[in-house]
Curated annotation (Swiss-Prot):
GO MF terms held by the record: tryptophan synthase activity
Signal peptide region: none
UniProt-listed InterPro entries: Trp_synth_b_CS, Trp_synth_beta, Trp_synth_beta/beta-like, TrpB-like_PALP, TrpB-like_PALP_sf
Known catalytic reactions: (1S,2R)-1-C-(indol-3-yl)glycerol 3-phosphate + L-serine = D-glyceraldehyde 3-phosphate + L-tryptophan + H2O
Keywords from the UniProt entry: Amino-acid biosynthesis, Aromatic amino acid biosynthesis, Lyase, Pyridoxal phosphate, Tryptophan biosynthesis
Protein name stated in the entry: Tryptophan synthase beta chain
Taxonomic source organism: Sodalis glossinidius (strain morsitans)
Top-level class of the enzyme under EC nomenclature: lyase
Annotated family: Belongs to the TrpB family.
Modification type N6-(pyridoxal phosphate)lysine: residues: 86
Cellular component GO terms, alphabetical: cytoplasm
Recorded superkingdom: Bacteria
Enzyme Commission (EC) number: 4.2.1.20
Subunit structure: Tetramer of two alpha and two beta chains.
Amino acid sequence: MTRLNPYFGEFGGMYVPQILMPALIQLEDAFVSAQSDPAFQAEFSDLLTNYAGRPTPLTLCRNLTAGTRTKLYLKREDLLHGGAHKTNQVLGQALLAKRMGKTEIIAETGAGQHGVASALSSALLGLKCRIYMGAKDIERQSPNVFRMRLMGAEVIPVHSGSSTLKDACNEALRDWSDSYERAHYMLGTAAGPHPFPTIVREFQRMIGEETRAQLQEHEQRLPDAVIACVGGGSNAIGMFADFIDEPAVRLIGVEPGGLGIETRQHGASLKHGRTGIYFGMKSPMMQSAEGQIEESYSISAGLDFPSVGPQHAYLDSIGRAEYISATDEEALDAFRRLSRHEGIIPALESSHALAHALRMIQAEPEKEQILVVNLSGRGDKDIFTVHDILKARGDI
């Protein structure tokens, strides 16, 4: 059986308890064989098209760029069934779980989007599903919690640590250590132990492939830059993957700047963390001086993660991709501007990427450029959060 490289440069690896090694090796073998199995690929493709609704549109913004020479396109992952890009790769992983004879799915979720995607794919394919979610995230994402339960998933609150995504990940891994013979751990981002970063990238890469084909149709050329938010990094690596070998295309990842990098209330682990071992991988992460994992912070639950996928760390280390941050305030402003001027309510996660695109446009209004923002999810789940913030300010 072909073995995949577990590393991206110095980043990645399989830093897990010995008990989980057979499960990871079984998963890698199943993935490698599925990649060359026409029947698996046909079923995956059929689900993406006829269940999830691919391809998603590439929408040209009509109003946000008025008075500039920029063309700003949005890759509309918000229109995918389930409301975000998460649906792509969970369908692939659910099919892998069935292929391996597993009957249960374990997942973690922050914003609830991966939880919803895990629940819908489990319901579709007849798998039992339990989802770990930080108690704090359950409070701020109640619509998604109800959606998960409606589709038959058990949602398990996690009260340890910061009661957010980091802690949900830890609990999910603990569960998997006890149940891996019957359960598949459906990791929600392009991070964690090998082979998850590679599997998730490959099951998300249609985002960039479609973008390239659609832009070729609209503009007959490649974009100048593709921009995506980065928490763990799955939507970004899905967008970047097809453009990595195109040096003329800038790859820009936008981390959560929270209340400002100087406050340490942020989640910008790639540019402001240190390399260490966490969540089964070697990658940059937010650490205290003593090397303890620090709590991350973001207005966006889905970006509230103290590390980042190893391929992003590698792309940063070789200078192929650029990583910057956008603050809560900048994301909130982008959220409101897209809603007001284009009639599209984006997820707060995606709003970070949009915020940086708007900064780029504002900095060089006379520059002729084509930018693509991966609108990774829709903002229905965030309207109560935004409403409460604006109400407290007397701004609605």
